Amino acid sequence: NTAKRTLEKLLSVCICLCMLGAMLPAQVFAEEADTAQTETVQDTAPKDTVYLSSADDLIQLAKNCRLDSWSQNRTVVLQADIDLSSVDFNGIPSFGGTWEGQNHAITGLSLSQDGSVQGLFRYVQQGALVRDMTVKGRIKPGGTRASVGGIAGSNAGTIENCAFDGVVSGTSQIGGIAGVNTVKGSINGCAVSGTVYGSHFVGGVVGQNDGVAANCTNAA
């Protein structure tokens, strides 16, 4: 009887050990899968968001935006006020993403290069969104000087809750927010103060408006 009870105990221990061994790989696999999933999210998320906190950051962004598609499906977050008064900055060539200004200001903007379609953004693409930002500066290009705006030379996206304070000067299609607001463009809740000069199609908010402009104020 003693031998029989000892054998039964040994069998019970063996069964328990086998059950534990079967459970451990599944648990380890689940933990590894969770870790892999977390690492995947961490690797991909930052690639879609760009943070700006200095003039150098903005200059690098402008270089990247020479390629029209670079900013598409990206979010740009302005994390601090940026002063451009002591740097060489010629505007952002083309923007097609989402710009979150977070109520910060870009000051000291000075654009004087020759050509048309000038502004902080030369082109705001269809589907793009620029919002919650103040721009202060002087935009007086040389040469043809058409389609000049404080925020955008040409807008085919949405500009909302933005303000411009300063001087915008050109020949035709001159506006405090946008030189041209295309048929796909929308400008909403924006404000302009300062001076806007031009000969043809001149407006405090937008020079030539083919789209929607609403709830804006003009003190230019």
Which role fits each region the language model picked out?
Residues 12-22:
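Bacterial N-terminal signal peptides
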Residues 1-14:
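Bacterial N-terminal signal peptides that target proteins for export
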Residues 29-220:
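Surface-exposed repetitive/solenoidal architectures
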